[in-house]
Amino acid sequence: EYLPTVHGFDEFHGNLYHLNAEEEPEQPDYPKDLPVFQNFFKPRGVLDCKATDVDDPTEDPRFGRVGKQTIRDTGPLTRKRMETIEDDLLARSMDFIDRAHAADKPFLLWHNTTRMHVWTRLSERWHDKTKFGLYADGMQELDWVVGELLAKLDKLGIADNTIVIFTTDNGAEKFSWPDGGTSPFRGEKGLGWEGGFRAPFLMRWPGKIQPGQVLNGIFSLEDVVPTVMAAVGVPDIKEKLLKGYQAGTKHFRVHLDGYNQLPYLTGGSGESLRHEFFYYGEHDLFAIRYQNWKIHFQVKDDWFAGALMRPTVPRPVNLRVDPFEQHMEAPGYPLYAGEKLWTIMPAAYILKLHAETFTNFPPRQAPPDFNPSEMLKHAMSAAASV
């Protein structure tokens, strides 16, 4: 029920998990001979799915009802297969573009590479390509994949009429170095520091977005849907979704926290419409940014083993003055923070407005919480309501 092909996508080909989960069955102490474990916990293989008009009532004991789609498991994503999976994914995307172009149909292609997620398994073609180590070699392969996709648009003569976005979903993962990234910002993926959230975002639309410009306004992945919808002629999708919107056979009534940033990107306005950003990590709100001010409500410095610290008074940082968030460790910081207490109240008000949106649009799914006491609390609450 969660596969893309029952949520608006015509086709889906890919894996469902982070790569380190995919290769877990190859560990020597993995319980290969325990049927219950295999049936309920083993990662699913690389899936090839297509949306259909025929409703398949088949019920899988683990994954649920098939519904209006076909699902073909092409086999596990083993360590060996990881070496060439990028070639497979690229070929699929190239074929999709070719078919859409031949049919003279506009298309949306969401190409997710497995680079650069741990663990990096490279073929001989990319091994030691850069002389800078495993991670740099993987980035070289990623660069090649992007280049091939852009070249395909050029070859078909549709590059000038195609919007291209390159981005990722979090900051660098540093703890797994040398099979991990780096950045000048404090922290990493999973933490509330800038290093956990700042990510590259490149957008190309020839004739509309001026090439070579660097924009420093706040921009979030939440802005992509309203912005791209505006580009294709629906500038008010956010407002329509609030009231209820029919797209094909599906009805949506949702709250998007994004902004239509097309005027900002195309030069129609001088600044980003986004003035705030919420730093969520798992089930915690670490911080809020508004304008240049970032207010830390809780902090930690180790993603997996670090203790979460909730300071009595939230900690303000001016990201224009201290973009790398280093000054909080300075002896003079408490005095500075005391002088800047006025920055906290606007953040509290922004948080209040944010929380009010959950009244009519509550979160659809709670994030995972591996604290056993919380699990027991939820279980007991559910039992009491029966």
Per-region residue spans from a language model:
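Formylglycine-dependent
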Residues: 1-105, 113-115, 119-122, 311
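Loop/turn elements at helix/coil->beta-strand transitions in domains of secreted/extracellular proteins
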Residues: 7-10, 102-109, 158-164, 198-199, ...
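Histidine-centered active-site microenvironments of extracellular/periplasmic hydrolases
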Residues: 1-7, 113, 118-138, 144, ...
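Long, internal low-complexity/basic segments
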Residues: 290, 295-296, 301-302, 308-315, ...
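A structural signal for well-ordered alpha-helical segments within the folded catalytic domains
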Residues: 7, 87-91, 140-147, 219-226, ...
